[in-house]
Amino acid sequence: MSLSRLLIKDFRNIENADLALSPGFNFLVGANGSGKTSVLEAIYTLGHGRAFRSLQPGRVIRHEQEAFVLHGRLQGEERETSIGLTKDKQGDSKVRIDGTDGHKIAELAHLMPMQLITPEGFTLLNGGPKYRRAFLDWGCFHNEAGFFTAWSNLKRLLKQRNAALRQVSRYEQLRPWDKELIPLAEQISTWRAEYSSAIAQDMADTCQQFLPEFSLTFSFQRGWEKETDYADVLERSFERDRMLTYTAHGPHKADFRIRADGAPVEDTLSRGQLKLLMCALRLAQGEFLTRESGRRCLYLIDDFASELDDARRGLLASRLKATQSQVFVSAISAEHVIDMSDENSKMFTVEKGKITD
C-alpha cells in the first residue's frame, strides 16, 4: 500500500496540513527548522504510534495544544484503507481504522511497513545491541504472525522475573516464571536466527553494491551460550541474577554483529561509509519483505544529501526507484533531489510549518 493522502493537525510546528501524495517519490524541501522533518516524523508516528526524535508525546504536540491528530489514506491494488491516530500529552492514544476505534498501534505498523534513514540512524551500527535487535525484530514482526504476541509476553515475563529476583532466596521460587519464559525465549531466538539467515544473502549483495571495497560478514548472537539449553542457563545463573536483580542472559541480550574485513564496522568505516551501509541494510530488508510477502515498504529519508557524494546519492536513488516503493525524501535544496524527480513525483516546499506543492 502507498499513502495517498496525509492530514496533519497540531504536530510539531505544523498547525494544519492536507497533502495529496505520489505513490512514487515525494520531496520535502526547506531550510533547517522549517518543518520538513516533522512531515517525515508525522508519517513515522502514524505507523508506529511514536515519533523518532522524541518519546515524550508532549514534545511533538504543537505549543499550547492538547493533542495531535494524524490521518492517512492507504491505497492498495484492490482496496483503500483509512487510518488515524490521536495522542494527547498524557500519552493516551486512539487508533482508528476504516472508521472504527479501538484498534492497536501494532495494526498500524502492519499496514504501513516502513524504513527510516536519518542522520541519527548510525545507532544501528555503532549503538548498543538494542538497535540491532530492533532491526531483526522488525523483520520477524512482518514475517511471523505470532511474533508480536510472543515478544510482548516475553517483555512482561522478564519484568516480572526481575521483580521476583529481589524477593526470592531459592531458584525453585522462580520456576513458575521460567516455565513460561523458556519456550518463549527459544521461539523468539529461533525466529530471529531464521530471519537473519534468510536475509543474509540479500544484505551481502546490496552491501557489495554500495561498499565493494569491503568484505562484510553478519552474525546473530542469541543472548546465551551456543549449544546450551536456556533452562540450564537460567538455573545456573540464579545467584548472579539475584545479586544483579535482573536476568543477565536471554533473547533480550541478543545482538546482530556486522564486520568489515574482520573488524567491527564502527571501528573501520567512515561516517559516509556507515551511512551507505545503513542505507544498504534498510534497502535489503525492504526488498526482502517485498519478495517474501508481496508488500512494499515506505521509505523515509531525512537530510538526503548529508554524508553522501553525488555518485553515492545517485546509486541510492536508482536502487530506491527499482523497489517501486513510495519514498519520502527531505532536503535543504531542490538541487540535491532534482535528479531523482520524474513525471510521477511530487515536490513540496516547507516553510515555518506551512507546506505547499
Swiss-Prot record:
Keywords: ATP-binding, Cytoplasm, DNA damage, DNA repair, DNA replication, DNA-binding, Nucleotide-binding, SOS response
InterPro entries: DNA-binding_RecF (IPR001238), DNA-binding_RecF_CS (IPR018078), P-loop_NTPase (IPR027417), RecF/RecN/SMC_N (IPR003395), RecF_2 (IPR042174)
GO function terms (MF aspect): ATP binding; single-stranded DNA binding
Cellular compartments annotated: Cytoplasm
Pfam families: SMC_N
GO CC list: cytoplasm
Domain of life: Bacteria
Residues bound to ATP: 30-37
Any Gene Ontology biological process: SOS response
Family note: Belongs to the RecF family.
Function: The RecF protein is involved in DNA metabolism; it is required for DNA replication and normal SOS inducibility. RecF binds preferentially to single-stranded, linear DNA. It also seems to bind ATP.
Protein's UniProt name: DNA replication and repair protein RecF
Gene name in the database record: recF
